């Protein structure tokens, strides 16, 4: 009886996440590959949701409860985990004593992107507290991204009450599956390289093919540029362009030569 009830809940969750992916794709087409790059995996050992770069793991009870609050919450939770993968947060090695600041920094960076996307499917107007955090960070770094926020937290070493307040505000998913060791076709290195390729193609698509779709996604684009620091020369552009298998008129004036 319990197993039947659980299977029914998993089926419901699969439908919820299918609708979530479709809605996000319709609004953010340049995220197509990324949105479908995680296997959906129910897990009763989790209290909420988590990703290891290969799967989106979720507690069925948690996901159904989130959906009852609203589909926006499900959309934000799923995209939150996708963005952790896109920016390589999952595989960055940190010492045990650094994990609190690193986890918080990554969550702030991802939530900043979500709060900046002017889409109804993600709409959750940031509270004054969030806005104050973002404004304070932007006075110190030009782009809010995981590495930058992490180093600011390290340097500031804020009172633990302040840290606890930020953790409460920005935590969405569990990071317990991050930094896993292993080997094989689903090894961390293999996953990291795969997501790096997705990130490269996505930045190019935002630059060349999806200017309208990317409008309003400046926070996302800025973080992509931080991760993809190398500038395109002509050969690199053509190489990545061919992978996209798209037809376009190459405008040689649209890039810098280094």
Predicted features by range, described:
Residues 1-74, 78-120:
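Basic/hydrophobic alpha-helical interface regions
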Residues 115-258:
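Negatively charged
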